[in-house]
């Protein structure tokens, strides 16, 4: 290298040329490509730590005056494309060492938006706020409506996401393979094949959308690597499967009730495709390693632009399940309602059958009335009957004389008038005195004393 290349201006030119080269990799006359329209074959190559083709092969001619690139540059680009495809396929089975990943981070001062996704170690990811926006537009033919997720604040000790990199979205050939149930509602989640979206883990299992299952619930999720069945269609990606896993960490009962994620049943129609029963992945053998993902270090926000699909929840917890299984009790039967309804119907009396509901009701009422009468006879009257005229005349009476009157009572309680001379007074067995006309009228309806409520007929029984 010449000494002039170490000056700051050629370095800036090299960086600008690398930017122009990335943008010129796609065909020029085609319209601007959107992220969801790009396939896995259009991803540009990733940067190797021991390859510096970007600085050595750039010419100093401005981008607008350059013509077709030389043959050696095209051959090197094709070799890097093939090498990147082989590396992205083998990334699930080998892991780059930590020092090599740091070497990848250092020489790259600029990250273009269409750089291929690469594995990031949790310790190598800086604690910064990155945002990933996956927008799935209506590419499915009258199918599910787009769902957009916003993931923010990746902690250094959590699961690193390929934030800041290009995440290809689903097209009509990449149908969602799994769904997430949030609080009783099934939400279809886009399933991206493993070579297109990967997250680093200890075992490096292919994670289809591993960043999005723990969105609302706080349960960790057990991720199974997708296995293709023999009858799996070749144009469909391998479907993912999320299985809830109970850990020993302490959680509140509300979180245990709300956090449920399950796979949708067989023949679930997503978009214009229907999964047959054979398309579901088989169970994972016991010897395969499993990776646990927790949602604690990820503070995420979810924005759904569409209403939830009309799926009913499968599992109900606690008392709600017991209440839903109990049938509603039948309404009570009113015997007087049916004859009334039948009488409203226009049925001829000669043709219509005879009904005996009213007779049965009347018989029951008559029996009840007779029983009440028998009870009244045994108990007697609540209010005793008045005395007869003969019984009233048998009570003692005398003319009032103020000179020889010995009783302390000086007035009649019935009429509230004082006793006068030569008035006829009647004395009850309780020794209470009244005007004869006043007390006789009282005793015709009552057999007790108006003052003390004593029985006025006891004198007659004693005399008899």
From Swiss-Prot:
<keyword id="KW-0833">Ubl conjugation pathway</keyword>
<dbReference type="GO" id="GO:0061630">
    <property type="term" value="F:ubiquitin protein ligase activity"/>
</dbReference>
<feature type="zinc finger region" description="RING-type">
    <location>
        <begin position="412"/>
        <end position="453"/>
    </location>
</feature>
<dbReference type="GO" id="GO:0016567">
    <property type="term" value="P:protein ubiquitination"/>
</dbReference>
<keyword id="KW-0539">Nucleus</keyword>
<keyword id="KW-0862">Zinc</keyword>
<feature type="short sequence motif" description="Bipartite nuclear localization signal 2">
    <location>
        <begin position="64"/>
        <end position="79"/>
    </location>
</feature>
<keyword id="KW-0808">Transferase</keyword>
<comment type="pathway">
    <text>Protein modification; protein ubiquitination.</text>
</comment>
<feature type="region of interest" description="Disordered">
    <location>
        <begin position="1"/>
        <end position="94"/>
    </location>
</feature>
<dbReference type="InterPro" id="IPR001841">
    <property type="entry name" value="Znf_RING"/>
</dbReference>
<keyword id="KW-0479">Metal-binding</keyword>
<feature type="compositionally biased region" description="Polar residues">
    <location>
        <begin position="38"/>
        <end position="53"/>
    </location>
</feature>
<dbReference type="GO" id="GO:0005654">
    <property type="term" value="C:nucleoplasm"/>
</dbReference>
<dbReference type="Pfam" id="PF13639">
    <property type="entry name" value="zf-RING_2"/>
</dbReference>
<dbReference type="InterPro" id="IPR013083">
    <property type="entry name" value="Znf_RING/FYVE/PHD"/>
</dbReference>
<keyword id="KW-0863">Zinc-finger</keyword>
<dbReference type="GO" id="GO:0008270">
    <property type="term" value="F:zinc ion binding"/>
</dbReference>
<protein>
    <recommendedName>
        <fullName>E3 ubiquitin-protein ligase RNF38</fullName>
        <ecNumber>2.3.2.27</ecNumber>
    </recommendedName>
</protein>
<comment type="function">
    <text>Acts as an E3 ubiquitin-protein ligase able to ubiquitinate p53/TP53 which promotes its relocalization to discrete foci associated with PML nuclear bodies. Exhibits preference for UBE2D2 as a E2 enzyme.</text>
</comment>
<feature type="compositionally biased region" description="Basic residues">
    <location>
        <begin position="64"/>
        <end position="83"/>
    </location>
</feature>
<feature type="short sequence motif" description="Bipartite nuclear localization signal 1">
    <location>
        <begin position="6"/>
        <end position="20"/>
    </location>
</feature>
